[in-house]
Structure formats: C-alpha cells, structure tokens
UniProtKB/Swiss-Prot annotation:
The keyword Zinc-finger does not apply. SUPFAM superfamilies: Ribosomal protein S20. Belongs to the bacterial ribosomal protein bS20 family. One of its GO terms (biological process) is translation. Pfam families: Ribosomal_S20p. Keywords: Ribonucleoprotein, Ribosomal protein, RNA-binding, rRNA-binding. It comes from the Bacteria. This is Small ribosomal subunit protein bS20. Binds directly to 16S ribosomal RNA. GO terms for molecular function: small ribosomal subunit rRNA binding; structural constituent of ribosome.
C-alpha cells in the first residue's frame, strides 16, 4: 500500500480511470453485438427498415470506437481493427441477397 499522499491519490485516480475505461470497452462490445444482430435480422428479412437499422447501429458503433480512441481507452490500431471487422461483416450482409 502507498505511504505518501500523492501515491494514495494516484491509486484512487487509476481506479477511477479503470472503471471509466471498462465502461467504454463494455459499451463498444455491446454496440458491436447489436450491429451484428441487426445484420442477422436484415439477412433473414431484407427490407429498407432493417437496412436503416443496420446503418444506424454501425454509425453508433463507429462513433463510440472513435471516441474511445480519442480518449486513449483503445489504441488507434485496435480501434481501426474493430471498425474494419464490423465494416467487413456489414458489407457482406448488405451485398449478399
């Protein structure tokens, strides 16, 4: 355990940041899963409403990934990799009919 005041404060700050980062990462995973679920829904029933739902969920996921990269929660390469994987899956679903 830390002995001086500044070390104790750093422990508190690190714990606070860890929880915030965990929240961001969890939300990124959730939005990714929702996007993939919407793609499956579109594959089963291709119509314009489901297509719009897929595009909206992709935009939300990309936006949150970009924000996480900007706040150094994710490394920029990791964020680009996540976006690339989502984009590849969505592109495959939207082009295959």
């Amino acid at each position: 355990m830390a002995n001086n005041k500044s070390a104790k404060k750093r422990i508190q700050v690190a714990e606070r940041n860890r929880l915030v980062n965990k929240s961001y990462k969890s939300t990124v995973r959730t939005l990714t899963k929702k996007t993939l679920a919407n793609c499956e829904k579109y594959k089963q029933e291709p119509n314009s409403d489901n297509k719009d739902l897929v595009l909206v969920s992709v935009n939300q996921a990309f936006s949150l990934i970009d924000k996480a990269v900007k706040k150094n929660v994710l490394h920029k390469n990791n964020g680009a990799n996540k976006k690339s994987k989502i984009n590849k899956v969505v592109k495959d679903f939207l082009t295959s009919k």
